[in-house]
């Protein structure tokens, strides 16, 4: 391969290791937007990451295969036109969702909610435990349950791929 694409933010360190012995240019999505190791790794939900990564992939292919430079530029332009439609819908929706509180059992949708200008109302203790991949305390779980029962949360994000006995107590 001449170009390899990874997530970054310590989500897929194996990808970096696999690309190192090759001559492939590694494009790491997180790095294109300045997202560092330890930050939220669910970067593909970020408009900035998608756009920056598309441009970085295009540049990598243009460098690896300069005879098709114009073709890659055309494909990038076509992709951006579609992405712009999505971004327009997100911007339109954000006018309605700005400031609305949401809560999440884990941070998978954080970047999307941020683009929608929503407010993360996930109880801090629970959010910190989830981010550190540790168990929340019984008090954290109760705080989350109470937050949901209070009725002010407008969107609840549950990642079924991360379901466990703790999330069962909340959902």
Task: Locate predicted features.
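Extracytoplasmic metal-acquisition and chelation regions
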Residues: 1-171
């Amino acid at each position: 391969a001449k170009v390899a694409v990874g997530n970054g933010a310590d989500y897929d360190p194996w990808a970096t290791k696999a690309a190192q012995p090759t001559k492939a240019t590694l494009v790491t999505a997180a790095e294109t937007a300045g997202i560092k190791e330890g930050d939220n790794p669910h970067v593909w939900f970020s408009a900035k990451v998608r756009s920056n990564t598309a441009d970085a992939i295009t540049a990598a292919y243009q460098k690896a295969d300069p005879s098709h430079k114009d073709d890659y530029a055309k494909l990038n332009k076509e992709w951006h036109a579609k992405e712009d439609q999505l971004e327009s819908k997100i911007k339109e929706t954000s006018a309605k969702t700005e400031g609305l509180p949401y809560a999440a059992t884990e941070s998978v949708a954080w970047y999307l909610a941020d683009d929608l200008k929503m407010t993360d109302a996930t109880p801090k203790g629970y959010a910190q435990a989830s981010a550190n991949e540790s168990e929340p305390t019984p008090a954290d779980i109760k705080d989350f349950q109470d937050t949901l029962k209070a009725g002010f949360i407008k969107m609840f994000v549950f990642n079924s791929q991360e379901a466990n006995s703790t999330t069962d107590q909340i959902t």
